[in-house]
Design a protein with these regions (language model features):
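Interfacial/gating helices of multi-pass transporter permease domains
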Residues: 39-44, 80-88, 109-129, 161, ...
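Small-residue-rich hydrophobic transmembrane alpha-helices
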Residues: 1-13, 120-184, 221-235, 239-243
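Hydrophobic/aromatic residues within transmembrane alpha-helices of membrane transport systems
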Residues: 4, 9, 19, 31, ...
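Hydrophobic alpha-helical transmembrane bundles that constitute the permease/transmembrane domains
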Residues: 3, 7, 18-26, 47-55, ...
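Short membrane-interface helical motifs at transmembrane helix boundaries
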Residues: 175-200
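Interhelical loop/hinge segments that connect adjacent transmembrane helices in multipass membrane
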Residues: 43-46, 55-99
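Alpha-helical transmembrane segments of multi-pass membrane proteins
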Residues: 1, 15, 197-227
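Membrane-interface helix-loop junctions in multi-pass transport and translocation proteins
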Residues: 11, 21-55, 186, 238
């Protein structure tokens, strides 16, 4: 995905991701409703869909004649090549691992309020993720544009891109906050309805958690994504690690 993004093939990334999502949903539906399989087969569906993405990645990586085409002859593990990559990547790796661990700790702490709260928190995070995933897409694209302008010495345009990105991210967060809260009932109904029947208590808990989660997530996280795009574009990954901690 990183190579395709560097090539500027955002449409190819979109097509691949959409196909993987459709493939995973189709296989999962077949396993559950067609074969009446257990929950383990959901993981199998994920493996199959990700395996397809892996095969396509290898194919796209080895095809073409541009600078990003994979070649064993071009592989060099020299310090001037590896060190900058590690210096930029390591803080990002630590940041993402710490973020994942933080979510795990929060979910673990919520066990004191009962299993219903834990489930509601997880579902609320998934619903809120609809907004954050879109914002992350703008973040990735914005970081690339800022980095390109910085490399070309056009700092003014790079900063202009950042301020435009702030407006886009905040506006997107506000719009999605309104939409998701309006349709919170129908969305959460899908999660509160199971083989055991409709659980109104569980749905109300999901909505209650989501109200606060979205209030502190949609717009603020959008602005945060714009700031992260600016820092990534200028190569300040150590600063992003400090800010997120």
């Amino acid at each position: 995905i990183a190579i395709e993004r560097s090539r500027g093939n955002s449409k190819r990334i979109l097509r691949l991701n959409m196909f993987v999502i459709i493939l995973k949903l189709s296989i999962t539906a077949y396993f559950i409703y067609g074969l009446n399989a257990d929950i383990t087969m959901i993981a199998v569906a994920s493996v199959i869909s990700q395996a397809f993405l892996f095969v396509m990645a290898i194919h796209n990586l080895c095809s073409g004649n541009d600078a990003f085409t994979f070649s064993f002859k071009s592989i060099r593990f020299k310090k001037n090549v590896v060190n900058p990559m590690l210096n930029l990547s390591f803080p990002v790796i630590v940041e993402k691992v710490a973020f994942a661990m933080g979510k795990t700790v929060i979910n673990s702490m919520s066990k004191n309020y009962g299993s219903v709260t834990v489930g509601a928190l997880g579902i609320s995070n998934n619903i809120n993720g609809i907004t954050t995933q879109m914002q992350n897409g703008f973040q990735d694209g914005g970081a690339s544009i800022i980095s390109q302008n910085r490399g070309a010495g056009n700092i003014k345009r790079a900063l202009g891109t950042f301020w435009r990105l702030v407006i886009i991210e905040a506006s997107l967060g506000l719009i999605m906050y309104i939409i998701l809260n309006i349709f919170a009932g129908p969305i959460t109904y899908l999660f509160a309805n199971s083989q055991d029947g409709y659980n109104v208590e569980f749905q109300n808990m999901i909505i209650k958690v989501f109200r606060y989660d979205s209030l502190g997530g949609c717009v603020p996280l959008g602005i945060n994504a714009a700031v992260m795009a600016l820092l990534f574009g200028f190569g300040k990954t150590k600063l992003t690690l400090f800010c997120n901690f």
